[in-house]
Amino acid sequence: MKTKKGENLPVVKFEREGRSIEVPKGANLRKSALKAGINVYKGINQILNCQGHGLCGTCRVEIIQGDKNVNSKTPMEEWVLKGKFLIAHKVKPNLRLSCQVKVDDDIVVLTMPEYEIDKEETIERVKIFAVVTLFALLFLVGLAFIVLDFIGKL
């Protein structure tokens, strides 16, 4: 199909689903997929997600072909893909959040791709969390002693 100016519309091929859709240039990948009845979420994430705000990381897709035909990854998107809290993920360069992808030309997409846990990074995060938690608990115990001493209960 062509636009009013006679340009071809970008085609998004969904590898897993075996379907292709035409989208306007600059279209949001997540919105376009959902509008066409293509699910980008796994399991319970069909209900529990951030509705396309780029915060939860549940609409991951892998751009198999045409990764130059979409907008660049933002630092926030990279952070969400890597894993925000204790568990870190290995991020392939072509792994994206579909809600953050703007389609400029033809692409091939794999929905719900597998991803690996980054064991070393996860271990480092757990160590840091343990140290911070220990200091927080020590601070709270110290604060409790100060408060009890102040009110004369010790």
Can you name each region flagged by the protein language model?
Residues 11, 19, 79-100:
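Polyanion-binding and phosphate-handling cores
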Residues 40-67, 89-104:
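Local cysteine-cluster metal-coordination motifs and their immediate loop/turn environment
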